[in-house]
Amino acid sequence: MTQKKRSPSSTRWLKEHFDDQYVKKAQKLGLRSRAVFKIDEIQGKDKLLRTGMTVVDLGAAPGGWSQFAVEQVGDNGRVIACDILPMDPIAGVDFLQGDFREETVLGALLDRVGPDKVDVVMSDMAPNMSGTQQVDQARAMYLIELALDMCNQVLRTNGSFVVKVFQGEGFDAYLNEIRKLFSAVKIRKPDSSRARSREVYIVATGFKL
């Protein structure tokens, strides 16, 4: 059988990935992924996570953000995580594997959260990329709309929301939607986010509902 050759774009991505200083640093420190440096930088600027908080982490696998969050909230806090992909266990993290887009999975996640409101909703969700920007953008926007809907269901008054968003069609409308629901909204582009990536993080605090 002839081995399928990698496309130039995938070969370039692999080289960029393994040459990435943050990938190397994450491996050296035994961290789940380079994504932990993004939430670490956001935490340094915005102080979203504190001891004793309850946090929901959407799109959690392989666990970088959950790993960071559980260290921040400590033994008296809670981290409830969800992803369609499997994730190796992390002490102190209640992980649910399932497709967040499905009602049954959402129901199971809400059961894990319980009756009390949460302090922070985090979303690093991203769709499987097709390579067609219009399709990928629509899929990404759908996921972040679901994340915002999660805030409406579980986030306490004055709670916080941090979400990965890809700049493109629908971005401005989504940003305006968040500004109506939160007292303060900032856009962050962490140093560890690849420069050519369209991703930014919306950091919203002071939930009004």
From Swiss-Prot:
Where in the cell does this protein reside? Cytoplasm
* Chief location category: cytoplasm
Cite the EC number: 2.1.1.166
- Enumerate the GO terms in the molecular function aspect: rRNA (uridine-2'-O-)-methyltransferase activity
The EC class name is transferase
Q: Which Gene3D superfamilies match?
A: Vaccinia Virus protein VP39
Where are its TM segments located?
none
Reactions catalysed, semicolon-separated, are: uridine(2552) in 23S rRNA + S-adenosyl-L-methionine = 2'-O-methyluridine(2552) in 23S rRNA + S-adenosyl-L-homocysteine + H(+)
List the InterPro entries: RNA_methyltr_RlmE, RNA_MeTrfase_FtsJ_dom, rRNA-MeTfrase_E, rRNA_MeTrfase_gammaproteobac, SAM-dependent_MTases_sf
* Claim: Cell membrane is one of the keywords in the record: no
Give the residues the record marks as binding S-adenosyl-L-methionine.
G63, W65, D83, D99, D124
* Keywords from the named record: Cytoplasm, Methyltransferase, rRNA processing, S-adenosyl-L-methionine, Transferase
Name the GO cellular-component terms.
cytoplasm
Q: Which Pfam families match?
A: FtsJ
- Give the active-site positions: K164
Q: What does this protein do?
A: Specifically methylates the uridine in position 2552 of 23S rRNA at the 2'-O position of the ribose in the fully assembled 50S ribosomal subunit.
Name the NCBIfam families for this protein. Answer: PRK11188.1, rrmJ
What family is this?
Belongs to the class I-like SAM-binding methyltransferase superfamily. RNA methyltransferase RlmE family.
The protein's name is: Ribosomal RNA large subunit methyltransferase E
